Every structure is written in C-alpha cells, then in structure tokens.
Amino acid sequence: MSDKEKLRELAEITDLVFAMQSAEIQETTRQQALIESKLAKLSKASEDAQARFQSDVGLRFGGADVMWQAWLGQQRKSLNTELAAVLAEKERRLQKMKFAFGRKEVAAKMCAEAAAIKRSDERDP
C-alpha cells in the first residue's frame, strides 16, 4: 500500500469519525430541545394553574395550590437536573468533535500536499 493510499484511508477514517461525532452532537441537541420544551410546557401549565387558583377559592382552601406548587417544584428540579446533565454531555461531545474536526482537516491537508508533490514530481522529469 502506497503512502498516498494510506493518507487517503486516513482521511476517510477521520471523515467518518467526524461524522459520527457530529451525529452525537445532533442527538444531544435534540435531547436538549426536548427537555427545554418540557420546561416551557411546565411554565405555561404553571401560569394557567395560577390563574385558576386565583379564581377558585375552593382550590386554595383545599390545599390544591400547595400540592400543585410542590409537584411543580419537583418536576422543574428533575427537568433542570436532566438538562444540566445533557448540557454537560453536549460540552464533552463538542470537545471531542473539535478534536475530530482538527484531525480531519490535518488528514485532508496531508492528502492535498501529497497530491501536489506527486503532480510536481510528474512534471519534473
């Protein structure tokens, strides 16, 4: 196997690794968006419930508002914890993707330089 073929294979491998890292980032971003959507829905439900509690005195006296707020707090805490974990994972994956991108670029540059040298050698008898 020639050096040029080895470089081409190296470039293909680094491209694949970068594509894999990019796919992982997309999945993590999808998870982040899902959690953020759930948090937004929870905030909307909180606003709606607050208006209902203001208009229905029976719900307040029955303690439904307190139970709702406790449940709401637990849900927010859970979702925010999950979001923090996803964001930490996203940051870790971004670092890996940056490294993979660097390798991909170096391999591509090495292939281009090898091709340029070969062309130069072919022109010079």
Model segments located where?
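Charge-rich amphipathic alpha-helical interaction elements
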Residues: 1-125
